[in-house]
Amino acid sequence: MDSPEKLEKNNLVGTNKSRLGVCGWILFFLSFLLMLVTFPISVWMCLKIIKEYERAVVFRLGRIQADKAKGPGLILVLPCIDVFVKVDLRTVTCNIPPQEILTRDSVTTQVDGVVYYRIYSAVSAVANVNDVHQATFLLAQTTLRNVLGTQTLSQILSGREEIAHSIQTLLDDATELWGIRVARVEIKDVRIPVQLQRSMAAEAEATREARAKVLAAEGEMNASKSLKSASMVLAESPVALQLRYLQTLTTVATEKNSTIVFPLPMNILEGIGGISYGNNKKVTAKA
């Protein structure tokens, strides 16, 4: 932001405090006399209506009258010596066309945006710049390119609000001398090459697949831990094994299947288990 001394030096408003002088007063009285002589016709030429959202900057013999804008309402403009300029104080929408930008990581992209601003000082907007709207438009383009050129592509895609706020601050500071207040800056669209879009899509797909595989592996590991815990509980409690057997029979009986399953009774299973256990002991003894 410029220092107060620099702003005062570049500010053309109020730098000339000299009065009209003798010739100026003579012309003033002649103009006033002309208005009185042509009175009722001069009313239509000298009285101007300024709307609520407008202000009028009146130049009398080339100097801004009273160093401030007039309006709203009726204002008096003297013939031949007064010239006035209307200034609209409503918010202006400035669309920034797509700008070719080379990011910090050497990626070419096109970015467009929109700037909302309004004139808060009509005198500064008229006296300090030739065309305030054109100047603001060109400054918004260059500021957008300069700010985005210092960012990487990922920063532009993920940090639009921060970048827009930075652009707004720079524009607001630069246009203060012109009587402009920047209300908001928005980045509308970021266009990247098609080849880069495909690369980013492939990278995102690979990341999703890797994440899905990790989740599946974690699920299998948790399931195996649960099965191990359940098998240990059933091994320690024969009653629990019998209850599980009965639950399985109930489930099979309630399902409408074309295949009929005849489960073996528990005593037969226990007998088979006992025979197998005895054979294992004999083999161990012979060994």
Swiss-Prot record:
Topology class, membrane: Single-pass type III membrane protein
Outcome, altering residue 190 to P: Reduced oligomerization. Does not sensitize mechanically gated currents
SMART domains: PHB
Annotated localization: Cell membrane
Keyword Calcium in record: no
Modified positions (Phosphoserine) in chain numbering: 3, 237
Database matches in InterPro entries: Band-7_stomatin-like, Band_7, Band_7/SPFH_dom_sf, Band_7/stomatin-like_CS, Stomatin_HflK_fam
Record GO biological process: signal transduction
Sequence ranges on the Cytoplasmic membrane side: 46-287
Pfam assignment, any one: Band_7
Keywords for this protein: Cell membrane, Membrane, Phosphoprotein, Signal-anchor, Transmembrane, Transmembrane helix
GO cellular component: cilium; membrane raft; neuron projection; plasma membrane
Signal peptide annotation: none
Membrane-spanning segments: 25-45
Deletion phenotype: In deficient mice 35% of skin mechanoreceptors do not respond to mechanical stimuli. In addition, mechanosensitive ion channels find in many sensory neurons do not function. Tactile-driven behaviors are also impaired in mutant mice, including touch-evoked pain caused by neuropathic injury.
Tissue-specificity statement: Expressed by all dorsal root ganglion neurons and is selectively expressed in neuronal tissues. Detected in olfactory epithelium.
Assembly and binders: Homodimer. Interacts with PIEZO1 and PIEZO2.
Family membership: Belongs to the band 7/mec-2 family.
Role according to the record: Required for the function of many mechanoreceptors. Modulate mechanotransduction channels and acid-sensing ion channels (ASIC) proteins. Potentiates PIEZO1 and PIEZO2 function by increasing their sensitivity to mechanical stimulations.
Protein name: Stomatin-like protein 3
